[in-house]
């Protein structure tokens, strides 16, 4: 029977992403201000729109920020204040998944300004390209700075501490990392968001097993190279449960099972009670977990 998208999770090709970058007067969201916003909206690899504006921070720019970004007092002086920019930018983001390099920095400034101006907080899901890169290409690059990754993936956009250019470079890096992730069986949004922890597992190549599992109750069976059952488990959400094996910190117990396992089978059940009954039908020859 063909599974629905709800069973598998939202396919990445159906997800709208907004890749963003902010320039600011410093590192503290509560004490510093936004000077520039740049963002691009993508779905299915296609750019749907862009957002770009300077922002008058309402304070003098620190000398080191002018030197770093090239943004000057003359540039931000005639620019709109953040209270004039933020409503339009929030509308641009909509319910998209937010992507950024060290994205928590950008989200911190957005949340602080939304709170100060009396807007509802952002509840969007987000993906950090820095965390993804640490898991997917850490052996290929000396570090995971945006400039390093841009050179590694030969992006056409050059990150230069200007918001739109950095957002464009981040978007190209993100799509290159997506290609790596799909090679591990990451085809749905939940799996992508979980990847920074699951990809650290030494048996990460077997993570592609997760892609075939529905989000339904059932039984899963780890098998060795000869097809013998190593372990039978039940789950209310097969996909989430098996994926958790790759992010578990208890490597002493989980590690031996994943090292020996060479395949994974599953049986979809109507509910948890039916799943319990199935676990008694096929007993493991070796109960590792």
Enumerate the language-model features and the residues they cover.
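Short active-site oxyanion
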Residues: 95-98, 227-230, 264
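Conserved small/polar residues in nucleotide/adenosyl-binding loops
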Residues: 279-285
């Amino acid at each position: 029977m063909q599974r629905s998208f709800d069973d598998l999770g939202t396919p990445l090709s159906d997800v709208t992403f907004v890749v963003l970058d902010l320039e600011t007067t410093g590192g503290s969201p509560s004490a510093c201000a936004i000077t520039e916003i740049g963002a691009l909206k993508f779905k299915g690899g296609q750019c749907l729109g862009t957002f770009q504006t300077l922002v008058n921070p309402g304070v003098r720019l620190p000398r080191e920020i002018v030197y770093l970004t090239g943004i000057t007092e003359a540039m931000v002086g005639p620019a709109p204040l953040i209270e004039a920019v933020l409503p339009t930018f929030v509308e641009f983001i909509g319910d998209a998944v937010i992507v950024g390099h060290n994205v928590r920095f950008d989200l911190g400034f957005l949340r602080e300004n939304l709170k100060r101006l009396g807007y509802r907080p952002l509840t969007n899901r987000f993906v950090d390209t820095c965390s993804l890169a640490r898991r997917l290409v850490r052996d290929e690059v000396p570090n995971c700075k945006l400039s390093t990754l841009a050179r590694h993936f030969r992006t056409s956009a050059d990150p230069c501490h200007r918001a739109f250019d950095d957002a464009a470079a981040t978007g190209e890096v993100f799509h290159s990392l997506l290609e790596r992730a799909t090679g591990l069986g990451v085809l749905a949004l939940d799996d992508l968001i979980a990847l920074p922890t699951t990809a650290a597992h030494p048996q990460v190549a077997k993570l592609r097993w997760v892609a075939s599992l529905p989000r339904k109750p059932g039984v899963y069976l780890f098998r060795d190279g000869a097809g013998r059952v190593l372990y039978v488990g039940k789950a209310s959400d097969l996909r989430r449960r098996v994926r958790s094996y790759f992010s578990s910190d208890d490597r002493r117990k989980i590690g031996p099972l994943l090292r020996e396992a060479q395949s994974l089978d599953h049986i979809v059940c109507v509910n948890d009670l039916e799943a319990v009954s199935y676990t008694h039908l096929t007993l493991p020859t070796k109960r590792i977990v």
